[in-house]
From Swiss-Prot:
Quaternary structure note: Monomer.
Enzyme Commission number(s) from the entry: 6.1.1.5
Motif ('HIGH' region) on chain: 49-59
Localization: Cytoplasm
Entry-linked InterPro entries: aa-tRNA-synth_I_CS, aa-tRNA-synth_Ia, Anticodon_Ile_ABEc, Ile-tRNA-ligase, Ile-tRNA-ligase_type2, M/V/L/I-tRNA-synth_anticd-bd, Rossmann-like_a/b/a_fold, tRNAsynth_Ia_anticodon-bd
The family this protein is said to belong to: Belongs to the class-I aminoacyl-tRNA synthetase family. IleS type 2 subfamily.
Name of the top EC class for this enzyme: ligase
Name by which UniProt lists this protein: Isoleucine--tRNA ligase
Cited function: Catalyzes the attachment of isoleucine to tRNA(Ile). As IleRS can inadvertently accommodate and process structurally similar amino acids such as valine, to avoid such errors it has two additional distinct tRNA(Ile)-dependent editing activities. One activity is designated as 'pretransfer' editing and involves the hydrolysis of activated Val-AMP. The other activity is designated 'posttransfer' editing and involves deacylation of mischarged Val-tRNA(Ile).
GO biological process: isoleucyl-tRNA aminoacylation
Main location, first listed in the record: cytoplasm
The species this protein was found in: Chlamydia caviae (strain ATCC VR-813 / DSM 19441 / 03DC25 / GPIC)
Reaction(s) catalysed (UniProt annotation): tRNA(Ile) + L-isoleucine + ATP = L-isoleucyl-tRNA(Ile) + AMP + diphosphate
Keyword Aminoacyl-tRNA synthetase belongs to the record: yes
Length: 1043
C-alpha cells in the first residue's frame, strides 16, 4: 500500500496542478492510448475552434463533455484517438486583421494587397494556440496536440476540393442569382444557417404607405419595416383568398383598401370610417398603381407596378398587402420571377445606394430610412408612421444588421438531397432526444440550397475555372491543377493560384473570384483531416461515421448541419452516430457573456480557485448538458467543491488516518475471511448499483443522469456510512468488525475512483494514488471501468436502508421544527406504516434509535390514537382551480377518513367526491397537519408517519448535558488540531448540574473524548461554553501525544 498521503490541508486546485505534473511526467495520456492499440476503434470528431480568441465557458463545457465520453470509452476497452483541429479560414480571422490594420473602408483590402492581407491572416491564426493548450490542459482534458489538423493546410484544402468536385459531378452544384442573407460589413453573402445564429430584438420603423391605384379613387395601404427598400418597389402582393375592404374616411372621403382582418389594427375608431364594399384578393390582381418613388418608372413597360397574387400573404401582421422589392426578399424574388416582374438591386456590397438612386447615392441604406419617410410624407403618401419591436438577424461575427439581397453565387443543391438528409437524421442518436424531430429535424425539413461562395480572400478558393464563353472546369486535386497549368503547386490559397490560367481547346479559363464558406471546410472535416481520398483511406473509412460528436445547440444549424449535408450527398450516410447537444452558458444575470460588460468570472481564475473538477462537475450536473441554458454562477462551482468534492477528500483522509494508524495491507487481507455487517453490504450494494446506473447512462450518452447517481453516492458514503461506522474504525483492537470496515471502505474507494475517473479525473487520480498497491496500474486512467458485481447487489437491503433513512429524516425534521437538539435524548419514537415495510425495518431499530437519539422505537401498523392527520385546502392553489366550489371542497376534505388521507399521501393525489362531481386534488392543493396529544409531535411522508415523544425527564436532561459536553470537548480537540489518538486532561468550571452529569456519565465522556483525567474547579482559565443553559469554562491540555 502506498502510504505517502498528501496533506488534507492542500487545496484541491493545488492537488490538480500536482496531478497534471504526474500525468505529464509519466506520459499517462499516451500510455492510455497505447494500452488500447489494436482494440475496437471509437471514432470521435472534435469540432474545430478558432484560435484567434481565448476559450470561453462554452468551449470548456463542450470540451468537458468530449473528455468524459473519450475517457469512459477508453476505460471501457476502446481505442479512442483524440486529435485536435483548428478552424483557420473565414470571417473570424479576416475581421481580426481588418481591425488591427484599420482596413475598414470599401476596397481597403484590395488597396492593401490581397497577398499581404492573406499572409497577415496566416500570422494571427494561431495567436492564442498556447493559451488554448493551457486552458485545455488545466481543464484536465486529454487531446493530442502533436497531430493537429488545420483547415488552412494544403492537404486539408485539397480534400475540400475533392468534396466539391464530387458534389459537382453529382449535379449538385450550380451558379445562380438568389436572395440570400448578406453582411454589408463583410461585403459577402452568408448561409441561411449563419443568418439564424444571431437574432436580436430591435426597434425598426413601422410605416404604412399609400399606393394610389390607377383608374380607381382608392389607395392600397402597404406596410413595411424597411423603408429603404421602397425605392426598389416593383410590385404589390395580395392574398387571393383574403377578403379585402374598401373604406372611406367619413370626414375627408379619402378611400383605402386593406385586408378586412387588419381593420382594427389601423382604425381604432370604427365610427371614423365607412366600409364601401368587400371582395376577395383575386379582384385586385393585375391592377396597376403609382409606386412610392419614380426611380425605376421605366420598368413599368417591363411589367412593374402591378398587383400580384401571393399565397404567402397573411393578415396576422401589416395590412394584408405586401410591398415587393424582389431584390431584397426571398418570397418577393420568387413571386416576381414567376410573374416576369423586373428585379432591380440599387445597393452595393457595402450596403450603400448606387448611382441608380441619386438622392441617396453612397449612403448606407439604414441611415436613409428617415429621409425616405420624410420624402414620402412630403408627397402625402404616408398613412401611418411609428416603430415596432421585432426580431432581426445580425451578422454572427461583426454583430451588424444583415440584409437580404440578390447576389450571384455558387450553390449546393441541398433541396435535392433533403430526403437523404432526413434519412440520415433517423440514424442519429440525439441527446436530448427532442433535437432529432425538433430543432434539427425541422431545420432539415426546411433546408434551402446552400450559398457556398464568399466574396472574401482568406479561405479555400472555389476550384472553378471559367472561360469568357461561360464554360467551366471544376478542379478536384492539386495534381489535376498542376497538369492543366504546368505549374508546381505548394499552396492553394487564392494569392498563390489566382494568376494560374488554364488553356484548353483555344479557350482561356480563369478562376472565379470566390472562396468557400468556411462552414464548407468544417463540413468536410471527416475526410479532409486525413487528406482523404489521397491518403489514409483505410483509416478514414474505419472511423466513418463517427461514433460520437458533441457541440452546442447553435451547431444544429451549423456544424451538425454541414456535416450532414456533405455526408448525405457523398455517401447517403450520416456523418456521426451519437450527438450530445449542450445549451448556452450565460452570465449570472441571464445575459450573454460579454468581455465588454465584464459580466462573468475568468474561466482560468475559476479553475485555479475551486479546481477544474469542481467546474466540470458543476457543468455536468446542470441543465446545460440537456441543451438548456445555464446561468453561470461561481457560487455554484464553490458549492460543488464544498458539498461534494471536499467531503469525498475527507473520506480519503479518514481512511488514510486509520489505516496508517492501525495498519491495513490491501495486498494481504483475505476477502473470504471478512464478515461484512449489514451496513457494509448496503454500501457495497449501493456502490455496484451506481456502477450499473453510470454504465447504463453512459451507454445512452446521458451524462446528466450518469452524474446524479455518483453524486448521491458521495452523500450516502460521507453522511451515512462513514458517520455510522466511525466507532468501528476507532477500535484499538484488531477485531473482525474493524477489518470488515477497512475492507469495505477500501473496496468502495478503489471501485468508486474508477467510476468517477471520466468525470472528475483529478480527484479520482488523487484517491487512486493514495490507496493503490504495488501491483496496481500506474494511474486510475489506465484501469478498466468497473462492471457491476451482481453477487454484491441487494435491492431489498437498499430499499430497507432507504426506508430507514426516510424515517430518520422525518425525525430530524421534527426535532428541527420543534427546536429539539439531536443531543437531547428522548424517550419514544413511533413509526406508522405498511406492515410489510415495517417488518423489514426491525433490523434497523437500533440504527434509527441511535440516529434520532431516542430510547425506544415503537412500530404501528395504524396511526395511534394520540395522533390525527388533518387535511385542509391550500387556498392559493385551489382558489384558482375550483373557484366558487372552494367551500364544497373544504367540507369534503374535513370528512376524509384517515385511510383516505393515507391514500393521498401515498399516491400524491386523491379523487375527491363533492356530491355533485368528482375532482382530482394534488398534494400541493392541500395543507397537511397533525393533531397530537400534548407532548407529542408528528409528521408524514408518502409511506410513513412518525411521532416523537417530546416529554423530558430528569434523566434525559442529565444525559443531554453529557452529550453536549462531549460535543464541546471534541470541538476543542479539533480547534487544537490534536491527533485522533492524543489523550487529554480537563479542568472544568460549571454548575452543579453539569458536574453531576459529568460524574454520572464519566466513562462515556472520557471514552468519547480520550480524557484521562478531569477536575472541577471554582475558577478555570479556558474556553467559555453554554452547556444547555449552564455557563461553563473548559481548559484542555494534552496528556500524551500519539507517536
Amino acid at each position: 500500500m502506498n502510504t505517502e498521503g498528501e496533506s488534507s490541508k492542500e487545496s484541491l486546485a493545488n492537488r490538480e496542478e500536482r496531478i497534471l505534473d504526474f500525468w505529464k511526467t509519466h506520459d499517462i495520456f499516451q500510455k492510455s492510448l497505447k494500452n488500447r492499440e489494436g482494440k475496437t476503434l471509437y471514432s470521435f470528431y472534435d469540432g474545430p475552434p478558432f484560435a484567434t480568441g481565448l476559450p470561453h465557458y462554452g468551449h470548456l463545457l463542450a470540451g468537458t463533455i468530449k473528455d468524459v465520453v473519450g475517457r469512459f470509452a477508453t476505460m471501457d476497452g476502446y481505442y479512442v484517438p483524440r486529435r485536435f483541429g483548428w478552424d483557420c479560414h473565414g470571417v473570424p480571422v479576416e475581421y481580426e486583421v481588418e481591425k488591427s490594420l484599420d482596413l475598414t473602408t470599401p476596397g481597403a483590402i484590395e488597396d492593401f494587397g490581397v497577398a499581404k492581407f492573406n499572409e497577415e491572416c496566416r500570422k494571427i491564426v494561431f495567436r492564442y494556440v498556447d493559451e488554448w493548450e493551457r486552458y485545455v490542459h488545466r481543464l484536465g482534458r486529454w487531446v493530442d496536440f502533436s497531430v493537429t489538423w488545420k483547415t488552412m493546410d494544403a492537404s486539408f484544402m485539397e480534400s475540400v476540393w475533392w468534396v466539391f468536385r464530387s458534389l459537382y459531378d453529382q449535379g449538385l452544384v450550380y451558379e445562380g442569382v438568389k436572395v440570400v442573407p448578406f453582411s454589408t460589413k463583410l461585403g459577402t453573402p452568408l448561409s441561411n444557417f449563419e443568418a439564424g445564429q444571431n437574432y436580436k430584438e430591435v426597434d425598426d420603423p413601422s410605416v404604412v404607405i399609400k399606393f394610389a391605384l390607377h383608374g380607381d379613387p382608392a389607395s392600397l395601404l402597404v406596410w413595411t419595416t424597411t423603408p429603404w427598400t421602397l425605392v426598389s418597389n416593383m410590385a404589390a402582393a395580395v392574398g387571393p383568398e383574403i377578403t379585402y375592404v374598401r373604406v372611406a374616411d367619413k370626414v375627408s372621403g379619402e378611400q383605402w383598401i386593406l385586408g378586412q382582418g387588419c381593420l382594427s389594427r389601423w382604425f381604432s375608431d370604427p365610427d371614423s370610417y365607412e366600409i364601401l364594399e368587400s371582395f376577395l384578393g383575386t379582384a385586385l390582381v393585375g391592377k396597376s398603381y403609382e409606386p412610392p418613388f419614380s426611380f425605376f418608372e421605366h420598368k413599368r413597360a417591363e411589367g412593374a407596378y402591378k398587383i400580384l397574387s401571393g399565397s404567402f400573404v397573411e393578415e396576422s401582421e401589416g395590412t394584408g398587402v405586401v410591398h415587393m422589392a424582389p431584390a431584397f426578399g426571398e418570397a418577393d424574388f420568387f413571386v416576381c420571377k414567376e410573374h416576369h416582374v423586373p428585379i432591380v438591386c440599387p445597393v452595393d456590397n457595402h450596403g450603400c445606394f448606387t448611382e441608380e438612386i441619386p438622392e441617396y447615392q453612397g449612403q448606407y441604406i439604414k441611415s436613409c430610412d428617415k429621409g425616405i419617410i420624410k420624402s414620402l410624407k412630403n408627397l402625402g403618401k404616408v398613412f401611418y408612421h411609428g416603430t415596432v419591436m421585432h426580431r432581426y438577424p445580425f451578422c454572427w461575427r461583426t454583430d451588424t444588421p444583415l440584409i437580404y439581397k440578390t447576389v450571384n453565387s455558387w450553390f449546393v443543391s441541398v433541396e435535392k438531397i433533403k430526403d437523404k438528409m432526413l434519412r440520415a437524421n433517423q440514424k442519429i442518436h440525439w441527446v436530448p432526444e427532442h433535437i432529432k424531430e425538433g430543432r434539427f429535424g425541422k431545420w432539415l425539413d426546411g433546408a434551402r440550397d446552400w450559398a457556398i461562395s464568399r466574396n472574401r480572400y482568406w479561405g479555400t478558393p472555389i476550384p472553378i475555372w471559367k472561360s469568357k464563353e461561360g464554360e467551366i472546369l471544376v478542379i478536384g486535386s492539386v495534381k489535376e491543377l498542376e497538369e492543366l497549368t504546368g505549374e508546381k503547386i505548394s499552396d492553394l490559397h487564392c494569392h498563390f493560384i489566382d494568376q494560374l490560367k488554364v488553356e484548353k481547346e483555344g479557350k482561356t479559363f480563369q478562376r472565379v473570384p470566390y472562396v468557400f464558406d468556411c462552414w464548407f471546410d468544417s463540413g468536410a472535416m471527416p475526410y479532409a483531416q486525413n487528406h482523404y481520398p489521397f491518403e489514409n483511406q483505410k483509416e478514414t473509412e474505419a472511423g466513418f461515421p463517427a461514433d460520437f460528436i458533441a457541440e452546442g445547440l447553435d451547431q444544429t444549424r451549423g456544424w451538425f448541419y454541414t456535416l450532414t449535408v456533405i455526408s448525405s450527398a457523398l455517401f447517403d450516410q450520416t456523418a456521426f452516430k451519437n450527438a450530445i447537444v449542450n445549451g448556452i452558458v450565460l452570465a449570472e444575470d441571464g445575459n450573454k457573456m460579454s468581455k465588454r460588460l465584464n459580466n462573468y468570472p475568468s474561466p482560468m481564475g475559476i479553475m485555479n480557485t475551486y479546481g477544474a473538477d469542481a467546474l466540470r462537475l458543476y457543468l455536468l450536473d446542470s441543465v446545460v448538458v440537456k441543451a438548456e441554458d445555464l446561468r453561470f454562477s461561481d457560487k455554484g462551482v464553490e458549492s460543488i467543491l464544498k458539498q461534494i468534492l471536499l467531503p469525498l477528500t475527507n473520506v480519503l483522509s479518514f481512511f488514510k488516518t486509520y489505516t496508517d494508524l492501525y495498519g491495513f495491507d490491501a495486498d494481504n487481507y483475505d476477502k473470504e475471511e471478512i464478515t461484512y455487517s449489514e451496513i457494509d453490504r448496503w454500501i457495497l450494494s449501493n456502490l455496484y448499483t451506481v456502477v450499473g446506473k453510470v454504465r447504463e447512462s453512459m451507454s445512452s450518452y446521458n451524462l446528466n443522469t450518469a452524474v446524479n447517481p455518483f453524486v448521491t453516492f458521495i452523500d450516502d458514503l460521507t453522511n451515512w456510512y462513514i458517520r455510522r461506522c466511525r466507532r468501528r474504525f476507532w477500535e484499538s483492537e484488531d477485531t473482525p468488525d474493524r477489518r470488515a470496515a477497512f475492507a469495505t471502505l477500501y473496496e468502495v474507494l478503489t471501485v468508486f475512483c474508477r467510476v468517477i475517473a471520466p468525470f472528475i479525473p483529478f480527484i479520482s487520480e488523487d484517491i487512486y494514488q493514495q490507496i493503490k498497491t504495488e501491483h496496481s496500474a500506474e494511474s486510475v486512467h489506465l484501469c478498466d471501468f468497473p462492471h457491476i458485481d451482481l453477487a454484491k447487489v441487494f435491492p431489498d437491503l437498499e430499499q430497507r436502508m432507504s426506508d430507514a433513512r426516510e424515517i430518520v429524516g422525518l425525525g430530524h425534521s421534527l426535532r428541527k421544527e420543534h427546536k429539539l437538539k439531536v443531543r437531547q435524548p428522548l424517550a419514544n419514537f413511533y413509526i406508522v406504516g405498511p406492515k410489510d415495510r415495517l417488518d423489514e425495518l426491525t433490523s434497523f431499530e437500533q440504527l434509527i434509535a441511535e440516529e434520532l437519539n431516542v430510547k425506544n422505537i415503537v412500530f404501528y401498523k395504524e396511526t395511534p390514537s394520540f395522533v390525527k392527520t388533518t387535511v385542509k385546502p391550500n387556498f392559493r392553489s385551489l382558489g384558482r382551480k375550483v373557484g366558487e366550489k372552494i367551500k364544497d371542497v373544504q367540507r369534503a376534505l374535513s370528512n376524509l377518513s384517515q385511510d383516505q388521507i393515507q391514500q393521498l399521501l401515498k399516491q400524491q393525489y386523491l379523487l375527491l367526491n363533492l356530491g355533485f362531481e368528482e375532482i382530482t386534488l394534488g398534494i400541493d392543493d392541500v395543507v397537511i397537519s397533525w393533531e397530537t396529544d400534548p407532548g407529542y409531535v408528528a409528521r408524514s411522508s408518502s409511506l410513513f408517519t412518525v411521532v416523537l415523544d417530546c416529554q423530558l425527564t430528569e434523566d434525559l436532561i442529565v444525559e443531554a448535558i453529557s452529550r453536549e459536553l462531549v460535543n464541546k470537548i471534541n470541538t476543542m480537540r479539533r480547534n487544537h488540531k490534536l491527533h485522533v489518538s492524543d489523550r487529554i486532561l480537563l479542568q472544568i468550571h460549571s454548575s452543579e448540574d453539569v458536574e453531576k452529569a459529568f460524574l454520572h456519565y464519566e466513562d462515556y465522556i472520557c471514552e468519547e473524548t480520550l480524557t484521562v483525567q478531569f477536575e472541577f474547579k471554582d475558577s478555570v482559565e479556558g474556553e467559555e461554553w453554554d452547556i444547555n443553559g449552564h455557563p461553563t469554562v473548559i481548559a484542555l491540555t494534552v496528556a500524551s501525544k500519539a507517536n
